């Protein structure tokens, strides 16, 4: 890849990661103010919105990026500009349709989410209010997403990265300010506070749009300067243009829906299953912990690992297109190994430190520290599946087998749908986690088979090195538990968030150092990270 594209990819990855970190950090003060009940109410609205947003955008932002990049490379800037205008019109229409459907269907979704009746102080009307407040964001976010895709198609990653961060900052400032003022100053009540917390999605979107508008004005000259240099135009009709665009968009739609769909299934089945099993008293709080508070923690290593590993995908596409299958196998190996090298120790660490970690972030008694720690313990290993599914789908797209990525998702979602309710009745939150894990495992097995079949990929080296990673992670785990045991003589993480933070930081630092040192001494670090590793560390023995 060119240095410009590499730099742009880094900027975009950094922006995305900063946004996700901010999206996790704000939950600390938010959870203190609204507790588990408020978290559940927030998720009832937000999970509906997330699914409708994915449907409304239809994968267009990523598809427009690919479309614009293709026609720009041919010098056909006129077709790129034509797509921007047409795409914005489509996003406006689909956003409005999604808004009206969600707004008008809110009573139905509210009843389903609550399990058919009022639940622990929350009524159907409360959930309807929150869903309708967040639905307003559907009028703006699709258009903003498409403009980001247009900039990315011109290899201008800065506008997307900066607008993502600003959108998140504006959203969080409004969310926390509104929640605090309504609860502490105006005594407006939990429902109104959470409603305005979800409404922050619209305010944040306006912030992101302002940034994009500033960038547009700043770069309008260079974009318009391309027009006189345009080559032969494709003269595509709108029908052909959108047909091509949909062919790009379809995989992004389905793959992007993976986590939202699994969350959506939990949101709409968990309470009903728990009530039928006789666990209504805890169902709502458990759902908030499962789908909001714990999941944010689980997604930290997922974000880092996938962002690091997916930078190799463009080179995979290039190798496949040129027919260089030997290089293709090496690149798939490096992508998979990079992700597993980062995600396995992170998951082991979070699992072993689930108690201190949950207490550090959500120390309030209203958020059930013991219950949260147990859910985090069992949920964190699923992060490995999340990461592998993302890269699995990306590789299938890279070798031009998008349809198999879609099929793998459908297989997993069907398994989740079938198993979720019976497993929740049997095992409560752990059952929902198990259903998610089984769904992702099925998707991954299918995806791995398709990659082997169509890319000629051998898993021999990957399996061998994964076993070594597990051994290194086990050694790291022993070090973490020893540190935690020693610290236990001086402080208890159960005494408060500060004590929990001390345990997490010291144990994680020691564990990480042990893992990296062992990997370095075995030459494992050098094998996997290669040139990404600073020169000082590129010595040592070589792992097999």
Curated annotation (Swiss-Prot):
Disruption phenotype: Cells lacking this gene are viable, have no defect in growth, but produce fewer spores, slightly longer cells and show an increase in cell chain formation. Also exhibits some resistance to moenomycin. Mutants lacking both murJ and amj have a lethal defect in cell wall synthesis. The keyword Oxidoreductase does not apply. Pathway: Cell wall biogenesis; peptidoglycan biosynthesis. It is found in: Cell membrane. Keywords: Cell cycle, Cell division, Cell membrane, Cell shape, Cell wall biogenesis/degradation, Membrane, Peptidoglycan synthesis, Transmembrane, Transmembrane helix, Transport. Belongs to the polysaccharide synthase family. This is Lipid II flippase MurJ. It comes from Bacillus subtilis (strain 168).
């Amino acid at each position: 890849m060119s240095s410009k594209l590499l730099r742009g990819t880094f900027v975009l990855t950094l922006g995305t990661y900063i946004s996700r970190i901010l999206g996790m950090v704000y939950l600390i003060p938010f959870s203190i103010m609204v507790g588990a009940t408020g978290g559940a109410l927030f998720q009832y609205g937000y999970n509906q919105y997330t699914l409708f947003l994915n449907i409304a955008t239809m994968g267009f932002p990523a598809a427009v990026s690919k479309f614009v990049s293709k026609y720009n490379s041919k010098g056909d800037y006129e077709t790129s500009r034509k797509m921007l205008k047409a795409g914005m019109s489509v996003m406006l229409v689909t956003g409005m349709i999604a808004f009206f459907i969600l707004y008008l269907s809110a009573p139905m979704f509210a009843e389903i989410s609550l399990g058919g009746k009022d639940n622990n102080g929350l009524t159907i009307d409360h959930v309807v209010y929150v869903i309708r407040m967040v639905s307003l964001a559907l009028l703006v976010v699709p258009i903003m997403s498409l403009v980001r895709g247009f900039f990315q198609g011109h290899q201008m990653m800065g506008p997307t990265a900066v607008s993502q961060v600003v959108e998140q900052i504006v959203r969080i400032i409004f969310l926390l300010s509104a929640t605090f003022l309504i609860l502490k100053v105006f005594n407006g009540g939990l429902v109104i506070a959470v409603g305005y917390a979800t409404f922050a999605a619209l305010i944040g979107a306006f912030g992101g749009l302002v940034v994009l508008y500033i960038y547009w004005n700043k770069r309008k000259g260079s974009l318009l300067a391309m027009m006189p240099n345009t080559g032969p135009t494709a003269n595509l009709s709108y029908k052909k243009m959108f047909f091509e665009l949909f062919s790009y968009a379809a995989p992004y739609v389905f793959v992007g829906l993976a986590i939202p769909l699994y969350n959506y299934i939990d949101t709409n089945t968990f309470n009903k299953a728990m009530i039928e099993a006789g666990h209504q008293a805890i169902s709502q709080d458990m759902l908030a912990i499962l789908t909001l508070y714990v999941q944010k923690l689980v997604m930290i290593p997922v974000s880092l690992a996938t962002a690091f590993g997916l930078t190799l995908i463009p080179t995979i596409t290039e190798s496949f297109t040129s027919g260089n299958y030997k290089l293709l196998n090496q690149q798939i190996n490096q992508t998979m190994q990079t992700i597993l090298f980062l995600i396995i120790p992170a998951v082991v660490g979070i699992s072993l430190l689930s108690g201190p970690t949950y207490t550090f972030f959500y120390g309030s008694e209203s958020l059930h520290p013991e219950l949260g720690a147990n859910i985090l313990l069992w949920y964190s290993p699923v992060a490995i599946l999340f990461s592998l599914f993302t890269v699995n789908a990306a590789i299938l797209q890279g070798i031009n087998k998008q349809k198999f990525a879609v099929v793998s998702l459908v297989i997993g979602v069907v398994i989740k749908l079938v198993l979720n309710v019976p497993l929740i009745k049997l095992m409560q939150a752990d059952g929902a986690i198990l259903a998610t894990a089984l769904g992702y495992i099925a998707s991954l097995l299918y995806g791995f088979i398709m990659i082997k079949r169509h890319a000629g990929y051998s898993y021999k080296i990957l399996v061998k090195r994964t076993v070594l990673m597990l051994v290194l992670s086990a050694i790291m785990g022993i070090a973490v538990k020893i540190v935690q045991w020693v610290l236990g003589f001086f402080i208890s993480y159960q005494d408060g968030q500060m004590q929990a933070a001390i345990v997490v930081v010291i144990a994680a630092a020691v564990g990480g150092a042990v893992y990296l040192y062992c990997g370095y001494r075995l030459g494992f670090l050098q094998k996997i990270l290669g040139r990404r590793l600073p020169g000082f560390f590129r010595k040592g023995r070589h792992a097999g």
